[in-house]
Amino acid sequence: MRILSLLLLTIFIGTSCSSQKTSDMTSTQMEYSAVSRGLYKLVIVQNKTVSVTNGKNTQPVVTNLSDAKWKEIVAEFSKINLESIPTLKGPTEKRFYDGAAIGNLKIVKNQKIYETPGFDNGYPPKEIEKLVNLLVDFTKE
């Protein structure tokens, strides 16, 4: 009887923790922007939807994400240490001489904002590269 109750308790706690993580992601907002004199791209992902703006005077296009794409984004997001985001450094510095647009990743989780310093669009810091590339892919669709 003890083993059965212990097993049920373990399953209950495990299920509770996984549903908590899922609800955390529904309130998390990821925003990627790339800006230069002639370029403006903004991608906002939140709660299985993506909003893409390609141009300063254009309306955003909002679409729903497939479950597979959402799980891919959540998997990459979970690998990131949010506290280290403000200290990340891009591998190149082309943005200083107009060689690349300025890229920026901003994450809002539990009403706290985590934002990278500017980096070259197309050359994100290695720690966030896969997530940024997933977000940039939405501007190509």
How should these model regions be labeled?
Residues 1-7:
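Sec-dependent signal peptide recognition
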Residues 5, 18-34, 74-76, 87-141:
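Short, well-ordered, aromatic-rich surface patches in folded extracellular/luminal domains
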Residues 14-16:
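C-terminal motif of bacterial Sec signal peptides marking the signal peptidase cleavage site
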Residues 37-67:
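Post-signal-peptide N-terminal segment of Sec-exported extracytoplasmic proteins
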Residues 47-52, 63, 71, 82-83, ...:
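Short, low-complexity, polar/charged sequence segments that are solvent-exposed and flexible
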Residues 60-89:
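Mature extracytoplasmic domains of secretory-pathway proteins
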